[in-house]
């Protein structure tokens, strides 16, 4: 009886460990800058494919530079990756993190899961954030409602985005779209005043497919990047002269934790970050350099630091609603894994409202259009939702 009970307990423990491992993704490096260092990536946005950006960067930092990288995703009820998912198992990995890479949009999680993030900031951990991280929470209730991007209480005005990164989604005092998203790409270059900053070593020009944001950096920020809106989605010299150059990224040396305490910690923010943006070598280089600088290892940054892609990387078209479905964290495990799997199905095409939004997305992405037309020809047929596109 005792043996049976013991075996049952051991089996339950093994199952629990396996379950936890299946819900997060870990890339373990062996040697390099990051030996003995742990970077945790939070990947949970609705649109810009943080679930692709984060693993791609994590692979580079682990394989090329020796870091241990843990990627935590929003998941659905079946354990598949879901942008904007309200369940993020594995947040306890933040307990021993040396650096946080934060890529989220409008999250709404359990108090327990948010608590691990709050604890990280209360101990003054460094952080790199991209794109929508300035508006990482929305609809959070109760204990952590102050983290919401639109929080107006004096105790944490502007929520996590404004207090940690220095901006929130607000046209007057924070960020807003600048140019036509999904239609106009942008050219991002180093700010002239920061040419000698270690993060910018080797960075010359980034083509970003994600549309520009107009940001208002906080007073204590060091400007790092400028952005010029293009009239084209793909890289070109066709500059939109109606849109003057604005800021696209900065660093700062402190933030306000949720308790209200000022923490001396390095912060880097960049307003690009869609997975398609990582097709730019300098786009990857800036973010890899940012992680190394934020962690305090800037003496290891080199002009020719290896930022080459690990494995196969085929980024998805960013959009809100239609994306690859059924992919689980372990599908992305291993150096040779593909981000994202070639056999992943396109989800969301049964929702007419989501399909309608695809029109301007597929216009600039002929390969995606061809795949959808092959698998769902009725959408392009006469009377179909994508007729004429």
Question: What is each stretch, according to the model?
Answer:
Residues 8-18:
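Bacterial N-terminal signal peptides
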Residues 22-34, 52-53, 63-64, 92, ...:
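Extracellular ligand-binding/catalytic regions of CAZymes and related secreted enzymes
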Residues 93, 102, 107-198:
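A glycine-rich, often tryptophan-bearing local segment used as a flexible ligand/cofactor-contacting loop or short
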Residues 1-6:
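Positively charged n-region of N-terminal signal peptides that target proteins for export
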Residues 40, 128, 222-224, 268-270:
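Hydrophobic/aromatic beta-strand patches that form the interior of the parallel beta-sheet core
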Residues 27-28, 38-42, 46-137:
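Helical hinge/lid and interdomain linker segments adjacent to catalytic or ligand-binding clefts
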Residues 24-25, 62, 68, 82-85, ...:
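Catalytic beta-strand/loop cores that center a nucleophilic Ser/Cys/Thr
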Residues 46-47, 107, 134-136, 205, ...:
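Short, solvent-exposed loop/turn segments at secondary-structure junctions
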